[in-house]
């Protein structure tokens, strides 16, 4: 990725509008969770948290948004989210994250998510869509207290499928680390998608002949890891999609990876998995979150 660093003919990294910052802090106030601190710098911003989950009126839903209509060359974004003790939060995006074509340099996004003691956090952004010649690196660092629960999702598309673009991006790298507050490593997911590299992105261990790849992690003390894995398997088995489920170390949870080529079918499958986890862990269904 460093080999692609250069001076673009548009606004360079570090210029106004190129460094997006979003800092959010949630605390439990009375009987519900509230956003008490917010700092945002364009192109990143949020919609005011909404209490629209009928089964969990204490849980705010926060939509992460971009004023720029997507990620463009030389963007440097950072999102820091601190969910304090006893909080319950759902975080998602307003729509898919579009990574636009780049002729110079690259774009990066760093996400730091902290789940405090006894918290319940859902971070479920919509899909990431890399356009032709996109160059993008994302690093997600999740710190989870042993008494906290985090549901974390990610979906990557092969490109603008409606336009026939499949793996026309230049590079797409993504690193995920899940740790305890003392630094103990629970999970690492390293994705290196380079259509021009030695390992084909359409290989059997990557996309194979599919157009979409999604992952869902459930780190929780609310149920044994085997039961979490069984919940995911039972939710996804009827979908007909290819998927694999595995438990995480130290009985801390489970995760699943799903591949497919029909965006609505994959979206329904991931929602079914999310809904099943909610019923199993907190006894309520997933809400209907309408998006544009």
Language-model-derived ranges and their functions:
Residues 126-128, 153-158:
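Short, surface-exposed recognition loops or helix-turn segments adjacent to catalytic cores
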Residues 84, 143-145, 179:
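Feature marks extracellular polysaccharide-active and adherence modules
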Residues 1-127, 132, 139:
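N-terminal, charged/glycine-rich beta-strand/loop interface patches
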Residues 2-21, 25-41, 108, 114-119, ...:
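N-terminal intrinsically disordered, cationic/polar leader segments
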Residues 88-90, 120-122, 149-151, 214-215, ...:
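Structural motif
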Residues 156-292:
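A structural signal for small-residue-enriched, beta-sheet-centric alpha/beta enzyme cores
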Residues 45-48, 100-106, 133-135, 161-165, ...:
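A short, polar/proline- and glycine-enriched secondary-structure boundary/capping micro-motif
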